[in-house]
Amino acid sequence: MNILAFDLGASGGKLFLATIDDDNISIQEIHRFENVSCSMNGALFWDIINIYKEMNTGIKKAIELTGDQIDSFAIDSFSNDFGLIDKNGTLLTPVRCYRDKRTERHADHIYSKLSKEQLYNLSGNQNALFNTLMQLAAMREEGHGFILDNAYKMLFIPDLLIYFLTGKTISEYTISSVSQMYDFKKDDWCQEILDTYNIPRRIFGRLTKPGTLLGGTQESYNRMMETRGFPVSIVCEHDTASAYLSSPLTTDCALASCGTW
């Protein structure tokens, strides 16, 4: 069995191929690339096209190494950043980086609608300028609300890449849960937060739990990549959640998780 994993970080991306044979497992890194944000006209963006290209380069290597026999593929990444697509799957805007200053410019007005304490009580998330909620609210503040109004779906970066592979729109649970828009008590999006900041609920994909077998890659992608196709699985897309899940925790231990901030 050949399992391919794509870990996208804020400074680089890596693809690992795991081969399971009887009771043995071997893991090899097959592709690595740099991921750098780009400043343009006072805003900060991710080069999502290059990320997609590099992901495909790694997938192509896995296809060659396995004789086109990939049994499962999954993605995790940093949280909060997203792409907005129309019904044809076209990106409506470049993908902003969480370090962009637009949230800082409008933080006071955003927090005047719901205080930091109220937001924490509703979502359970830390108050941070990079949260997805802050980014979406800042879009309204900067006169870009029409993009939200005309968007078909808002997809977190792993879900956006999965959409390009499968044509399916989802919102994975762990990465949704740290957006500052999720209600853990109701196990659903927090309608009070969405209503307060005029964020249309319809733009979110179907909430999907880790462990879900989403299905195979779409035919157009298979033709482009010259592959028979492969199954896509949903894991803990929030990279910190995946790190904790795979850690050998016991009752008497401490774990420090750190990445690129």
What spans do the regions from the language model cover?
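Catalytic phosphate/nucleotide-handling subdomain of diverse soluble enzymes
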Residues: 231, 236-261
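Pocket-flanking alpha-helical
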Residues: 105-109, 243-245
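Short, hydrophobic/amphipathic alpha-helical packing segments
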Residues: 52-60, 136, 238-242
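N-terminal glycine/serine-rich phosphate-binding loop of ATP-dependent small-molecule kinases
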Residues: 1-93, 121, 222-233
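Glycine-rich phosphate/pyrophosphate-binding beta-alpha loops
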Residues: 10-12, 77-81, 181, 237-243, ...
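Gly/Ser/Thr-rich active-site cleft segment
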Residues: 8-10, 120-240
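Carbohydrate-associated surface elements
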Residues: 100
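Short beta-strand-to-turn element immediately C-terminal to the catalytic PLP-Schiff-base lysine
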Residues: 18-20, 83-86, 139-141, 163-164, ...
